[in-house]
Amino acid sequence: MFKMVSSPHTHSGKLTAHIMLWVILAMMPAFFTQIYYFGFGVVLQSALAIGTAIIAEFIAIKLRGKKPLNYLSDFSVALTALILAMAIPPYAPYWVIIIGTLCAVLLGKQVYGGLGQNPFNPAMIGYVILLISFPLQMTTWMPPINLLQEPPTFSDAFSLIFSGLTTDGFTLSQLTHNIDGITQATPLDSAKIFYKSHTQLSDFYELIKLPIFMGNGTDFAQGWWQINVAFLAGGIFLILKRIIHWQIPVAMLVTFFCLATATAFTGFTHLSAISQLVSGAMMFGAFFIATDPVTASITPRGKIIFGALVGLFVYLIRYHGNYPDGVAFAILLSNICVPLIDHYTRPRVSGYPTKGRK
């Protein structure tokens, strides 16, 4: 007697835990690059996020009457926490990452039934809730630490996150007071605010000469483009390992680049398309967030449509919206469209005629 089982009858051989660990490994170049340019805050934020995520997931699974260890061992909750920790400002107050992680795990994942059931990317749910609820804390970034006279030590980072002061009693803003033209905003924030209030091209050229953009006089938005390149390298690694598919990141980046380039021909509007690609969370979102296998499209054509849709939304938000980045909102808006995309891009079943043929 043979036991009848439903399709599919093939298996990729990749366990969920192995996939999650490969993704975490691919994020390490960007993780250490962020430490190099912005200090140890991301280490502490990651530890807080992962610890909070494990506790929240353990309790949620226990309340559902299941065995927590069977679910925690897939490392998916650790990856969600790490993504969120790397997305927020490194020196945000400790309660910000705790609230965001709880929202990501409980509202973004467990409320739908756990891994594989959630329609939205959990980390982006947590991030957007934080951005809307605590805009000041979520937009206060320290400039690259090489611009500071006294870069914060690990002890300073710990003290800043938990008390708002360094071990010497300085606030985050006081650490940057000696740098001309420095604000506690990202280059994308600064460029967008400046563009809306200044229309002269010469004025904008003066902006990008400030230290946060030029650093030692050669780097545009130093720290940010290096982190984006590190995410790009990690993303290419995942594609080569066949952990993620190329369609989503390529479609997203190409769509955004084409739209941004076309906009540039209409006159001075914003940063160049290349500058946009290596700023903010563009590469992070393209390779590590939009490619989430649970919340992204699963059909070959659907992946291209989904990626292009994310790129379109990022363009609309960055160029015409109020938020300077827009990657998180773009991914969540595209997640809404996934069921419709998959419905209309399902591959033809073998043996059935193509549409329009008998």
UniProtKB/Swiss-Prot annotation:
Organism listed in the record: Haemophilus influenzae (strain PittGG)
Functional note: Part of a membrane-bound complex that couples electron transfer with translocation of ions across the membrane.
Entry's EC annotation: 7.-.-.-
Protein name, per record: Ion-translocating oxidoreductase complex subunit D
Cofactor: FMN
Membrane topology: Multi-pass membrane protein
Gene Ontology terms: biological process: electron transport chain; transmembrane transport
Catalytic class of the enzyme: translocase
Subunit structure: The complex is composed of six subunits: RnfA, RnfB, RnfC, RnfD, RnfE and RnfG.
Subcellular location: Cell inner membrane
Recorded superkingdom: Bacteria
Gene: rnfD
